[in-house]
Amino acid sequence: MKKKLLVLTMSTLFATQIMNSNHAKASVTESVDKKFVVPESGINKIIPAYDEFKNSPKVNVSNLTDNKNFVASEDKLNKIADSSAASKIVDKNFVVPESKLGNIVPEYKEINNRVNVATNNPASQQVDKHFVAKGPEVNRFITQNKVNHHFITTQTHYKKVITSYKSTHVHKHVNHAKDSINKHFIVKPSESPRYTHPSQSLIIKHHFAVPGYHAHKFVTPGHASIKINHFCVVPQINSFKVIPPYGHNSHRMHVPSFQNNTTATHQNAKVNKAYDYKYFYSYKVVKGVKKYFSFSQSNGYKIGKPSLNIKNVNYQYAVPSYSPTHYVPEFKGSLPAPRV
C-alpha cells in the first residue's frame, strides 16, 4: 500500500512539474507592443501584475515620473480606465505605451527580486519616445524611472545602457573617457574607447550598438559583427556587435514616427517623419555569423547574404531568436504599413 501511495505521489509531482514547465515555456513567448523590444531573458518578468487597477487614478501625462498609477497584467488590460492617456505607470518605475493595450504587459511575479533606482536619476537615463529596450538579465535588473510619455528602459547592474536618439546626425564628439551626454546620444562606454571616428555611432559595453553617421565604418576587432540597415538595437549574444550601415545605399537615418507615408528621405540634422520599414530587413554579413542571426522576410524584400538568426519584434528593432533563457516568436505574414 505504501509503495502504491509513493508511486502515485511521485507521478502527481512529475505531472505537476511538466505542467509548470509547459506554462513557463508558454509565458516566455508572450508578445509585446510593436514599440517594445523583448528582453533577452524572462519575458514573463517584465512588468508586475497589479490587482488594484480599478482604483488607479488618471495618468498625469505631463509628469509621469511622479505618477503612481499601475497597469495590470495582460488579462486585465481591457479593464483599465482612461485608455486615451499617453502612458500608464507600472510599479512607479515602468510605463507602457497607450496605443495598443492588447498584448503589452506580461506577468511579473518576482517583484521583490528587483532593485529600484532612486528617483533622482540624471537626464542620461531618459529614453527617447521612439526607442526602448530591456536588459537581458531580467532576474536582477535595475529599473530606471526617468521616462518620457511613452517608454521605459532598464539597466542590469550598470552593464546595459540604452541610447536616446533624437536626430539624424550628431554634431558633437563624445568624450570616450567618461559617461557622455548630448541631446542625441547617451553613452556609458567600455568598448567605445576603441572607436575614435567622429561619428556618434558607438558600441556600448558588449551588448548594444547605436545608429549614427558613417556607422558602417565600425567593425569590432576580434568579434563577429553584422551591419544592418536602419535602426537596430540588439541585446547581447556573447559579445556580438550589431551596427547599422550608413552609406550611398542607406541614406535613411531618421526617427520613425509611424506616419501614413512609407517613404523616407535623408535630411541633415532634421528628424524625418516617415519610415520606410522594408529597408530594415536589408543587411550584410561582415564576419560570418549566420548561425547566430537571421531575419524574417518583409514583403518579399530582402537584401544580403544567407539568413542570419535575428527575429523581428517590430519595425525598428531586432532581438536574438535564441539564448539559453530566451525565445522570441518569429513574425509571420506580411508587415503592415506603419500605423499612424
From Swiss-Prot:
Signal peptide positions are: 1-26
This protein's UniProt keywords: Signal
Remarks, anything else? Strain Newman has emp expression enhanced compared with NCTC 8325 derivatives.
Does Signal count among this protein's keywords? yes
This protein's record includes keyword Transferase: no
Q: What is the name attached to this protein's record?
A: Extracellular matrix protein-binding protein emp
Which compartments is it annotated to reside in? Cell surface
The Gene Ontology CC terms held by the record are: cell surface
Tell me which species this is from: Staphylococcus aureus (strain Newman)
Which cysteines are cross-linked by disulfides? none
Q: In terms of one coarse class, where is the protein primarily found?
A: other
Q: What does this protein do?
A: Adhesin that binds to the host cell extracellular matrix proteins fibronectin, fibrinogen, collagen, and vitronectin.
* Induction (record text): Expressed in the stationary growth phase. Regulated by Sae, which is essential for emp transcription. Repressed in the presence of glucose as a result of a pH-mediated decrease in expression of sae. Also under control of both Agr and SarA.
